[in-house]
Amino acid sequence: MASRKAGTRGKVAATKQAQRGSSNVFSMFEQAQIQEFKEAFSCIDQNRDGIICKADLRETYSQLGKVSVPEEELDAMLQEGKGPINFTVFLTLFGEKLNGTDPEEAILSAFRMFDPSGKGVVNKDEFKQLLLTQADKFSPAEVEQMFALTPMDLAGNIDYKSLCYIITHGDEKEE
């Protein structure tokens, strides 16, 4: 009888610890942020089974115009979860990344996906199309407002390095 109680206490303690662990993840973010992460998770979870798998990642990349993602890259992404990537794991991964990442570098990395030549610019028209049609779609007015503040080169391409600086440090012209 005593061993049964001890076993039950152990299970209860483990359950409480798991709940505490997952609740800590949710306490790292505001409710609005959690909702945005939930929307992002839903966009990636293409088959709507509550778990992000390799096929989900491949389809997400495909929708973003990147069709030849190496298997190793997809495997590496999935291995970061150390098991099935449900929403709680997804949120935990973002929490870990956001707490240890330089925001400017994270933004630059995202832009580099659209700059295969590494010139530091992205095509304005292609980027505009992505903003209007993918994930959290921008309205045409929002895109124009953003482009009004966006540094462009002479060819009309977005200088994303300067844009990242403005996003993370503010516009040096502002006073």
From Swiss-Prot:
Provide the positions where the record notes the PTM N-acetylalanine: 2
User: Which SUPFAM superfamilies does the annotation name?
Assistant: EF-hand
Q: Which residues are recorded as binding Ca(2+)?
A: 45, 47, 49, 56
InterPro entries per record: EF-hand-dom_pair, EF_Hand_1_Ca_BS, EF_hand_dom, Myosin_RLC
Q: Name one GO molecular function term.
A: calcium ion binding
GO biological-process terms attached to the record? cardiac muscle tissue development; heart contraction
Report the residue ranges that make up the EF-hand domain in this protein.
32-67, 102-137, 138-173
Q: What is the annotated tissue distribution of the protein whose record heads this document?
A: Predominantly expressed in adult atrial muscle.
* Pfam family of the protein (one): EF-hand_5
Q: How does it assemble?
A: Myosin is a hexamer of 2 heavy chains and 4 light chains.
Misc. remarks from the entry:
This chain binds calcium.
Q: What is the name of this protein?
A: Myosin regulatory light chain 2, atrial isoform
Q: Which organism is it from?
A: Homo sapiens
Taxonomic path:
Eukaryota, Metazoa, Chordata, Craniata, Vertebrata
